[in-house]
Amino acid sequence: MKRTYQPKKRHLQRVHGFRKRMSTANGRKVLARRRAKGRKVLAA
């Protein structure tokens, strides 16, 4: 049986990337929360 997680860089960026986050109001809220928390990495 093959493993279920078959990582692809393009998919990761398109679903969880910075530009995707910035493209919606809720995504910007996510970034704001992560900035407030002091995350070194804001998005994938």
From Swiss-Prot:
Residues 1-25 are annotated as: Disordered. It comes from the Bacteria. GO terms for biological process: translation. Keywords: Ribonucleoprotein, Ribosomal protein. The keyword Ribosomal protein applies. One of its GO terms (cellular component) is ribosome. GO terms for molecular function: structural constituent of ribosome. Residues 1-22 have a biased composition (Basic residues). Belongs to the bacterial ribosomal protein bL34 family. This is Large ribosomal subunit protein bL34. It comes from Oenococcus oeni (strain ATCC BAA-331 / PSU-1). The lineage of its organism: Bacteria, Bacillati, Bacillota, Bacilli, Lactobacillales.
